[in-house]
A protein has these predicted regions:
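Soluble periplasmic/extracytoplasmic beta-strand elements of cell-envelope proteins
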Residues: 85, 117-119, 174-176
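N-terminal targeting signals for export/organelle localization
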Residues: 1-58, 197
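A short beta-strand-turn-helix
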Residues: 52-56, 61-82
Length: 197
């Protein structure tokens, strides 16, 4: 078989496969967007990884404990715009961003906004509280989830993951990984959430 005949045969096979593919059900499959569609991603600046949700999303159900050991659920996150940070003491990026989160709470925390730390550390509340004290972040509200159920419930790929919640306790955005939370860009995100009554 000469070269021209070989190329003609290969071309006919490719063409035939293409016609077959586009005329069968698998060739007509349309790719749908992910159900949890987001409307925008901040594409520049220090918050470039922040993902804003198209519509607020209810948090899945999970529980955690407070300083007294009392079990709480996501209902305690309602009432204020909340920056919910899931972290652990063994997570180096989590440790690095903690002073930024404490600074954000000092500068913007109050009647309308709060930073809440939800430790996924398997060593429990006391270990996490000791770390916050060590880095001067004891001004942050701390809860502990020593089963790491929250991380699984919010489908976090790893730590840290930070969720921005509206006053109804619904997720309106998230950032996976560390961020400079005391930056002007982060404060602008928080102000926009607070102003969206």
């Amino acid at each position: 078989m000469n070269k021209n005949a070989l190329f003609a045969l290969l071309g006919a096979l490719v063409l035939g496969f293409g016609i077959y593919w586009f005329n069968t059900p698998q060739g007509k499959v349309k790719i749908a967007p992910v159900p949890e569609v987001v409307s925008e991603v901040v594409r520049q600046g220090s918050m470039a990884s922040y993902i804003k949700r198209d519509t607020p999303r209810n948090l899945p159900s999970f529980s955690f404990v407070d300083a007294s050991g009392a079990t709480k659920d996501v209902g305690v996150l309602k009432g204020k715009v909340t920056l919910l940070n899931l972290w652990a003491t063994w997570c180096a990026p989590c440790r690095k961003e903690m002073p930024e989160l404490a600074k954000l709470q000092r500068e913007m925390g109050g009647a309308d906004f709060q930073v809440v730390e939800l430790s996924e550390d398997l060593k429990g509340y006391d270990t996490s509280a000791a770390f916050l004290k060590q880095v001067g972040a004891e001004n942050l509200t701390l809860y502990s989830d020593d089963r790491a159920a929250a991380l699984d419930a919010v489908k976090g790929p790893g730590l840290p993951i930070t969720l921005l919640l509206n006053r109804e306790g619904q997720e309106i955005g998230r950032l996976i990984g560390p961020a400079p939370w005391a930056s002007d860009e982060a404060k602008a995100l928080i102000r926009a959430a607070v102003d969206a009554k």
